[in-house]
């Protein structure tokens, strides 16, 4: 029976995991099993935080719009409702940017609803 040297594929898979674990501390960057666990944990955390970032920015935009709209004597929910009724299709990110950078422009949006 001929000798079988263990696989190119397995070595590549392990090296790929260890490359992803570069920068981790101790055994988490040097040994395959702890590195694999840490890489999986890091991927879960990065996915979770990408989703959380979307929620956080939406919260920030709503807070900024609410503060700017209350200066004009209106509530946030009434402002958004009137935007939809008047068919002005500006998303919250754009409205928040206008509110922060161009108060006169934001005032004109509020008055034109």
Curated annotation (Swiss-Prot):
Superkingdom, natural source: Eukaryota
Plastid among keywords: yes
Assigned keywords, A-Z: Chloroplast, Plastid, Ribonucleoprotein, Ribosomal protein, RNA-binding, rRNA-binding
Main location: plastid
One GO biological process term: translation
Subcellular location: Plastid, Chloroplast
Molecular function as annotated in GO: rRNA binding; structural constituent of ribosome
A Pfam family assignment: Ribosomal_L20
Signal peptide span: none
InterPro entries: Ribosomal_bL20 (IPR005813), RIBOSOMAL_L20_CS (IPR049946), Ribosomal_protein_bL20_C (IPR035566)
Example of a GO cellular component annotation carried by this entry: chloroplast
PROSITE patterns: RIBOSOMAL_L20
Family to which this protein belongs: Belongs to the bacterial ribosomal protein bL20 family.
Summary of the function given for this chain in its UniProt record: Binds directly to 23S ribosomal RNA and is necessary for the in vitro assembly process of the 50S ribosomal subunit. It is not involved in the protein synthesizing functions of that subunit.
Name listed for the protein in its UniProt record: Large ribosomal subunit protein bL20c
């Amino acid at each position: 029976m001929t000798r079988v040297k263990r696989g190119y594929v397995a070595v590549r898979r392990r090296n790929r995991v260890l490359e992803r674990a570069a920068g981790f501390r101790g055994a988490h960057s040097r040994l395959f099993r702890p590195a694999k666990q840490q890489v999986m944990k890091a991927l879960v955390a990065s996915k979770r935080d990408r989703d959380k970032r979307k929620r956080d920015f939406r919260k920030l935009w709503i807070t900024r719009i609410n503060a700017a709209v209350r200066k004009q004597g209106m509530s946030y929910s009434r402002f958004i409702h009137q935007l939809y009724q008047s068919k002005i299709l500006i998303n919250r990110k754009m409205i928040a940017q206008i509110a922060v950078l161009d108060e006169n422009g934001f005032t004109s949006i509020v008055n034109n609803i």
